[in-house]
Amino acid sequence: MTWRESGIRIFTSQKARRVYNLARTRLWQSNSFGTTPNPNNFVVLRNINTSYAGFGQASYEILPKLTLTGGVRVTYDERTTRLITPPRNAAGVVTFPATAATYVRLADTQPSWEGSLRYEVNPDVNVFARVSHGFRGPTIQGRNAVFSSAFVTATSETITSYEAGFKSNLFGNTLRFNATGFYYKVKNIQLNGNDSNNNGLLFNANQAQAWGGEAELTWRPIRDLTLGLGGSVLHTEVNDTRVYTPVCKLNGVVTCTVLNPTINVGTATLAQINGNALPNAPKYQFDGNARYDLPLGNGGKLFLAGDVTLQGYTSFVPYKTIEYTSDGTFEAGLKAGYSGPDNAYELAVYVRNVTNEKNLKGVLDNYNAAVFNDPRIIGVSLSGKF
């Protein structure tokens, strides 16, 4: 039996920060709306994060070539946020809600653990299985104060995951092939949305689950040529019949095509998200790369390399829409250059996004704003190791 690691860790951080409502400040100061410039449009927050943990891990070879590894950790996690300077209007009158708390404290103690089995089929192939449980501590979002809104919070989420797969290094180390299948469930999952005033908010849903697989292959068919291929498939879904999230709405008008059932609560329009995919979780992703090196007499080498990525259906918000998704996005890159002896330095020319694709990478749904990838970039790079 091998005792791998144990100990106690303590972490604490304290930060006072000033948060500005930059968009409104610029508008007010430029008189875009005919309003008086407001130099008081900021807040000061003091955030204190404290964490204590005790942990241990051990491994035991229960049979020849079969190793069991287990570990446990207990963590205390505390967050506090205090409003030091509230927002004010141009006349100096406080605009933070009088009934809202100016100090919020959240704390939780949770165990984390894992257990795994690894079997060495031969020196080049091993198979494994693993189960683990962890958590993400509570969260306080104090920045809403700059918009004259109360703090928003989310309690701890826990995750239990299962995975199994194999790793291999074959044919004289010329072929490496690894594959894994997995399933995980997140209880009390923390999600992001926006309220009816377009302010960001945090909330908890009952649970979410996901399953899928991933694989990677690296092959060197000849000495100076390396080919790589990787891929993953993923299914995710939120499981909570009672959770709703605000949708894209600006000046009282829903501005995107919402595909989920909706209800109106006050000025907000809410969509039911039960069964929806998690945001930013592509259904599939494939990556390929290739590199050819031409050795030179001085120990350096010339090289030519390329890569490509293909990403499947992805939703960028918790609710289903037509506009806030991407599907089948594609991007490729090329690079050629010279690498010095022992890879001490490299001089190269490169092209990113060779075909100048315009791919949606994210959205700010409360402002109807899109985030796209970079356009085609052509450049020269020089790098070195010291």
Q: What positions do the PLM features span?
A:
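Solvent-exposed loop segments that connect transmembrane elements
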Residues: 17-44, 79-107, 139-153, 188-203, ...
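Outer-membrane beta-barrel channels and translocator barrels
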Residues: 63-67, 122-124, 159, 171-173, ...
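Conserved C-terminal beta-signal and adjacent last beta-strands/turns
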Residues: 1-6, 61, 129, 162, ...
